[in-house]
Structures are given as structure tokens and as C-alpha cells.
């Protein structure tokens, strides 16, 4: 296990199993409600589904999933495997979710006590949705920023992060630049989580 990536370990295999199992399962459709109290879900574009936070202070909180090109929210089972391995208590952790999308990964970290979580997203509609969610949860540790995830990592103070979360669009050229930038931003003993369409060999990371 290196400080720069979760690789060459049982957790990698377990996450891949969870990803494979979840791939066939569609995101749960949003139930129709006349008086929706969940403003974040109500703010989601037509056709949106939802996923849920699975641990911590916001356990079972619904997160909207908009029908946006390339948006792939990390399924519950995958997040459960990841965060069970990282630990239920992330108190004091500094985290950056570089391609936040629905915010599922970063909000999960904040729910488990992370001291600071920066959600970076380039899609304006998703940024607005994340801002509504942050306000609804009164998540003072969470900051939402519109922009490029790789640039955000490059701008981070070197060795300042305990957890870097990378789930970039699979059809974009983001993997190597994000890993390189993340390796500079993550502290000794910290971790980078990468979701990718293929397995990466150790020498590539």
C-alpha cells in the first residue's frame, strides 16, 4: 500500500467485485411526491434518480442523481466497501473530491467526520445541486467549487490532503494528470481512490 493510491491489496479486489456487482443494478428511480421536503432531490433535473449516504451522521440521506452525460454515481456497495476499509471515523481528515458529480464520495467522507471536504465539479447544474445539498445538510465542513478537478489538485498545498477521491469521466484524458496531481497533494500516509474503466498496473500508478 503506498500513500498515493489504493492498489495491490485486498481492498482493490473487493472494490472491483462491488463495482462489477453494482454495474448491472440501475440507480433507484426517484419516487414521485407532491410535496417533496428534500430540496436537493426536488432540484434535480427531470428523470433524476437517487442514491443514499450509507454511514455517519447523514446516514440514509438521499442524494439526487441527474441524468447527465457521463455521470456515474459510485454505488452504495462500492462506497460501503471503500469506507469500511478506510474506517468509520474520518475525524480530522482533509479530503478533495476532484470530480464530485453527485457528491456521493465526498459527502460520505464528511458524514463520517472529515474536517474538510472540497467538492470540485465542472458542470454548472451539478454544482448548483451540490450547493443545495450542502445547505440542506448544514455541512460546514463541505465546500463546493466549480472548476476542473486536476487544476484544483495542482492548486492544493503539497502534502495537504489525507484523502483524494478520483472518479473522472471515463471518456476523458483525466486519469494520468489527476493521479500525478493527486500524488503531490496527498500527505504521507494518505490515500487516493481511483475509479477507472480498467485495472491499472502498479507500475502505471
What are these regions (language model features)?
Residues 1-205:
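Class I S-adenosyl-L-methionine-dependent methyltransferase catalytic core
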Amino acid at each position: 500500500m503506498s500513500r498515493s493510491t489504493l492498489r495491490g491489496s485486498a481492498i482493490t479486489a473487493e472494490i472491483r467485485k462491488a463495482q462489477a456487482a453494482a454495474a448491472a443494478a440501475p440507480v433507484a428511480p426517484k419516487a414521485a411526491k407532491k410535496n417533496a421536503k428534500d430540496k436537493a432531490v426536488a432540484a434535480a433535473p427531470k428523470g433524476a434518480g437517487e442514491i443514499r449516504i450509507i454511514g455517519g451522521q447523514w446516514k440514509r440521506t438521499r442524494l439526487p442523481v441527474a441524468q447527465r452525460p457521463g455521470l456515474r454515481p459510485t454505488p452504495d456497495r462500492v462506497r460501503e466497501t471503500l469506507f469500511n476499509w478506510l474506517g468509520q471515523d474520518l475525524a480530522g481528515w482533509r479530503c478533495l473530491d476532484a470530480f464530485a458529480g453527485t457528491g456521493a464520495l465526498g459527502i460520505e467522507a464528511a458524514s463520517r467526520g472529515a474536517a474538510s471536504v472540497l467538492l470540485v465539479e465542472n458542470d454548472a447544474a451539478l454544482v448548483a445541486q451540490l450547493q443545495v445539498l450542502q445547505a440542506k445538510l448544514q455541512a460546514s465542513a463541505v465546500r463546493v467549487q466549480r472548476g476542473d478537478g486536476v487544476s484544483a489538485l495542482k492548486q492544493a498545498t503539497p502534502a495537504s490532503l489525507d484523502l483524494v477521491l478520483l472518479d473522472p469521466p471515463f471518456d476523458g484524458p483525466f486519469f494520468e494528470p489527476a493521479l500525478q496531481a493527486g500524488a503531490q497533494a496527498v500527505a504521507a500516509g494518505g490515500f487516493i481512490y481511483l475509479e477507472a474503466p480498467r485495472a491499472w498496473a502498479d507500475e502505471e500508478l
